[in-house]
Amino acid sequence: MIDQKIFETTLNIDDPANFCTNVEAHLLKELENIYVGKCFKNSFILNITGVIQRSPCFIMRTNNSGRGYMHVRFSALVSCLNAFDLIAAVKIIKNDSNIILGESLLTEPVTIVIPSSESQNNVAEVGQIVPVQLANSSVYYIPGRQQASATGSIFIPKHTFSVYHVQEELTQEQALNLTKLVNIIEMLLESRSKKDFKQICFFEKLYYTYSINSDEILDLKIWKGPKGKEMARLKPCNVLSFLYDALKNKSSSLGFWARPPDLFKSSPLAYQQDQNSFNTTELPIICSAEVMFVTLLKEIINYLQFMNDLCDTFNNEQLIKRHENIWMLIEQKKI
């Protein structure tokens, strides 16, 4: 995910006299030279956006070098990969009995290790582009490196889901804090609306948990879901509309929330019910309304970006056909 972050650091200054002739210009240049295009504090820095605070230039008195140093707080545009993130385009650069390596074509530079011990991963050939889900706690940002490293597997639709039990109402202030994530979703939806609808249908159907036919899709624009798959007696809730109502104190977040497999994962939909009747063996996760909505919104963002990236990457029929072995693998894993 692209984000803004604030960092603190101490810069060593080789020529304090020259540096202080134009501190702002020299400081920005120094920050760019050291950090842009490199890993730093669990992020990959794309651009320095500003200096927030700086100390005077201090002279080192422990030696006779004449060098100086300065404490700096700065903001930067960064890319951050997290556990379980989806990457739509990972190009396989090595595949042998010991290891499978891939490089992301869409995110910041990252090398992804794909375990060859998992048989599903061995279908990918060198040069092919595969969709990957990162493993848990698998992203490593080593300071100063020009790329991150991670572990992941070819992404297969998931059958499991979590149920969240919310026992306190979402406040207006909390709903306001969620508008940043809502805005990202709306931006991704706008981008999606400009893509080829046939491509969207292909990948939505491919990554739907159940096996379905094209004519079973009712309306992917609002993600009602395939015929016969809707949960009985339940009507899905549009999370975005719900949060806009929450800003006006016109909605209640109490109860049990979930996004089970009958919903398209890139949809802004979820189910809410008073009593837990979701078909899962896992116990409900008790959490605040804010934590639950952050979790749901980030999942929606992840899947929406994933679907948009798939459409952008596999943008012609020939490229899609060259990867039929990957699509067949995904279809075989469905319920």
From Swiss-Prot:
Keyword Transcription: yes
GO biological process entries: viral transcription
Function, as annotated: Component of the DNA-directed RNA polymerase (RNAP) that catalyzes the transcription in the cytoplasm of viral DNA into RNA using the four ribonucleoside triphosphates as substrates.
Complexes and interactors: Part of the viral DNA-directed RNA polymerase that consists of 8 polII-like subunits (RPB1, RPB2, RPB3, RPB5, RPB6, RPB7, RPB9, RPB10), a capping enzyme and a termination factor.
Gene Ontology, cellular component aspect: DNA-directed RNA polymerase complex; host cell cytoplasm; virion component
Expression induction or repression: Expressed in the early phase of the viral replicative cycle.
Subcellular location: Host cytoplasm; Virion
UniProt-recorded name of the protein: DNA-directed RNA polymerase RPB7 homolog
Top-level taxonomic group: Viruses
Comment on protein domains: Contains an extended C-terminus, with no homology to characterized proteins.
Origin organism lineage: Viruses, Varidnaviria, Bamfordvirae, Nucleocytoviricota, Pokkesviricetes
Keyword set, alphabetical order: DNA-directed RNA polymerase, Early protein, Host cytoplasm, Transcription, Viral transcription, Virion
Family: Belongs to the Asfivirus DNA-directed RNA polymerase RPB7 homolog family.
Main location: host cell
